Amino acid sequence: TAVFLMGRLAYLMVAKADYYNRAATGLHERERSIKAPRGRIYDRNGNILADNKAVCSVSVIHSQIEDEEAVIQVLNEYLDKGEAEIRKKVTKVSSRELIATNVAKETGDQIRELNVAGIKVDEDYKRYYPYGSLASKVLGFTGADNQGIVGLEVWYNEILAGEDGSIHTVTDAKGIELPNVKETRVSPVPGDDLVLSLDLTIQKYATQAALSVMEEKQAKRVAMIIMNPQNGEIYAMVDVPEYDLNQPFQLNTDLAGYESVTDGEKMDALNNMWRNFTVSDTYEPGSTFKIVTATAALEAGTVSLSDTFYCPGYKIVEDRRIRCHKTTGHGKV
């Protein structure tokens, strides 16, 4: 028995030393995340199209609460969550309970200054779009976790996101942070910036022009792309109606019977609003493709530059009559 116990002890001290060391550390250390600022998105001239706004997240640590009613009263006064919801979270026995995110920095600072035991206020970042709906279908937006959902925000998420940091604090057996023990901090790594070929001024003018056409023609939507033909750079990409990037879950059109529609129908309406039709749909090229067919005909020797044609306003192909946009025809061309 003694030999067995010695062998078991040696096994635990040598083979399982790292495991039990980590387990012991986990019992008296608490880790808090430090959010990394997301990379900015710029236009070609250095104008910021997507930025970060400092906000706060508010949590409670149950083991540190000295007066539950005081905690509930403070949070109810400063946060728009409702007393019943706040009370439910404050009285819940957990190591750390998140109460609210995206709290205005001024509000977070006010709560922190009250120094109520059990309430923790951490710095966070919220995505902010200074031009509202401008280029919304191109830029896309982020979710509550600051991760990209649609558009360039999700396409370049790994570049923009950065790496979160952390704060490690030492606690006693009850989970209360020890006041005189230095905390260990791992700094966050900010995300990389993204510079687009878009030109803010051209994008604004293109958006105004598209909105004017939509109103004049009573169209459901109007799309426009302005491109440099020499290198393919896109200076403007518009798909109106756009939506407010700072309130992406607010529909930009009326949905009949919105209160009675299903969640699935609401989600379909939102997805349709977020969709960039300039790149997600296919369209008949129309007259822009005439240069291709004309060049092919000249190259094949089917026609020459001196040939003329008569346009009666339609063309018979097999059993179909394909009409010209000018139904009376262009005559001799």
Provide a role label for each language-model segment.
Residues W274, S304-S306, Y310-V333:
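Conserved catalytic neighborhood of penicillin-recognizing serine enzymes
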Residues G148, L198, R275, D281, ...:
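Residue-level signature of the cytosolic catalytic core of signaling kinases
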Residues N252-S280:
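Surface-exposed acidic, glycine/proline-enriched linker/cap segments
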Residues T295-T302:
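Alpha-helical support elements that line or immediately flank enzyme active sites
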Residues G286-A294:
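Active/ligand-binding-proximal structured segments within catalytic/core domains
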Residues P229, A294-T295:
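Substrate-binding cleft of carbohydrate-active enzyme catalytic domains
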Residues T1-L255, T282, S304-L305, Y310:
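Periplasmic/cell-envelope proteins involved in peptidoglycan metabolism and beta-lactam response
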